[in-house]
């Protein structure tokens, strides 16, 4: 990496895409985590944004090297919180500070928004990601249960 990692917000708080070029450039890295995303990636993300999600990307040397999708909401248990739907760094650039840069940005944003908690889920098979989250001071606080409908 020649230039420092910078974080670019893709959409605003109303869900409007403000960086269409970066949204398109995010797709290959995002698919490293979510291979099942549909071919109409931009339309899918617009629907996700319409439901309150935000997206930012980590950029270096004019390339997207990391993606985060997140949302701020309030519930009865944690109050106002940030929930991270997706967090992925380019598999060819792992352990280069990308995940930490994204997490730092997200946590700063969460604090600025008055969030009391920062949450994410990570698949049970993602042991490397779990080690990263533990190193970053995160702890397992619950089990997430799911059932296909």
PLM features per residue range, with description:
Residues 110-122:
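Conserved GNAT acetyl-CoA-binding A-motif
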Residues 89, 95-108, 135:
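Conserved acetyl-CoA-binding loop-helix of GNAT-fold acetyltransferases
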Residues 73-84, 94, 140-141:
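A conserved beta-turn-beta hairpin within the catalytic core of GNAT-like acetyltransferases
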Residues 57, 63-72:
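Conserved beta-strand in the GNAT
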């Amino acid at each position: 990496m020649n230039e420092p990692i910078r974080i670019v917000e893709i959409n605003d708080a109303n869900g409007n895409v403000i960086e269409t070029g970066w949204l398109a450039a995010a797709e290959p890295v995002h698919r490293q985590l979510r291979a099942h995303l549909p071919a109409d990636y931009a339309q899918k993300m617009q629907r996700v944004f319409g439901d309150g999600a935000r997206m930012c990307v980590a950029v270096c040397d004019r390339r997207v090297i990391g993606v985060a999708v997140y949302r701020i909401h309030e519930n009865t248990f944690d109050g106002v919180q940030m929930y991270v739907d997706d967090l992925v760094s380019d598999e060819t650039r792992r352990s280069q500070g990308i995940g930490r840069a994204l997490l730092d940005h997200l946590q700063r944003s969460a604090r600025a928004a008055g969030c009391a908690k920062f949450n994410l889920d990570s698949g049970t098979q993602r042991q490397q990601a779990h080690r990263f989250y533990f190193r970053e001071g995160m702890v397992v606080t619950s089990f997430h249960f799911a059932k296909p409908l």
